[in-house]
Amino acid sequence: MKMLAQRTAALFLATLCTPLLSLAAAPQPTHEFMLDNGLKVIVREDHRAPVVVSQLWYKVGSSYETPGQTGLSHALEHMMFKGSRKLGPGEASRILRELGAEENAFTSDDYTAYYQVLARDRLAVALELEADRLASLQLPAEEFAREIEVIKEERRLRTDDKPSSKAFERFKAVAYPASGYHTPTIGWMADLERMTVEELRAWYQAWYAPNNATLVVVGDVGASEVKVLAERFFGDIPKRAVPPAKIPLELNAPGERRITLYLQTQLPSLMMGFNVPGLATAESPRQVHALRLIAALLDGGYSARLPTRLERGEELVASASAWYNAYPRGDSLFVLSATPNVQTGKTLAQAEAGLWRQLQDLQQNPPSAEELARVRAQVIAGLVYERDSITSQATAIGQLETVGLSWKLMDQELAELEAVTPADIQNAATTFFTRDRLSVAHVLPEEKDNE
């Protein structure tokens, strides 16, 4: 009966993977070209609806910032909505709003991006507005004085007054001892207090150049029409010299690091992070895709190992998770977190030991082919359905290009995941889950003596 069940499960997983992988074999038509001023343009056709997403990505984020000047990239993102030579503060957003467009922006360690989602026949408006602020952002001192207070309040609400965010910020600063990834994207409060509009203007002049940007357009468009519009609105913006930007590399084995934080939280928790490569820095892409699947083996839903073994089985933790970013500009972290089950009297030390047991199990015993196939099918299904969105497609393209990789990898990654074997899982676990790569944060409820 057990053999029959295993064969049935294997057949189900095979039938699930086949149509998903077939989608990877027939990607949407994608075109790329570069303007004379260095602006790279990537167009991906998706004609299912008369809608288009336009994203402009700049190769600058918090990992580019130096001590004492943290938060500049995020602050500049805010100020990009505060007026250009043609338009006053907020006027571009008003125009887009009246056209029924969605717009926003985001900043990370590695990039800053601005996007609009709108009807295909309004694409010219979005590109004209985006080119205008690239060419002639004004950065008025009075607008900066108001906006920096908004940013400081954002930091208070999202980080300083939010224990989980504050804990991760401190943990990240310890886990990345050698690279700019230890810098919080929003910046340290001391640097926000001292930031000047002159610093922001210098940051804009240094990094906001067409030859440091990638325009991604996905939707009901063709390459020729986008090229005409890109030339019209961006073609006359001159290229500029951009500062050199080195890849953020970490120490391979910086040594075990530990911090204990006392915060205004009701329950204790812990984080464990291992210094590992990303796709841009790995010796082999197979290592990276193995780490992605390990994260899913541990925390890929109800039947994953952490909830099955530690949460419901041993009742050791109330919750546990695993997370890995495969696509930074430099090195990455593989992060585990857990909250011990205080109702059964479990401690942080016991929860940490339980997480270690799961990693050691992967080091000593490769997963079965059936378990790996099930997890891989979940990961592939998630990627396929996520890419059904034109916004997700554009974001994947922009992220890859901006961290120094090729957009073509998004059309190859399903096959790369399919190639990972149980032995690859075991090898990655053995190579990367070592104590000299480890950072640990224990978060405890604030004690009265520490107030």
Q: PLM features: what roles do these ranges have?
A:
Residues 44, 49-75, 89-133, 164-190, ...:
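M16 family metallopeptidases and their MPP-like homologs
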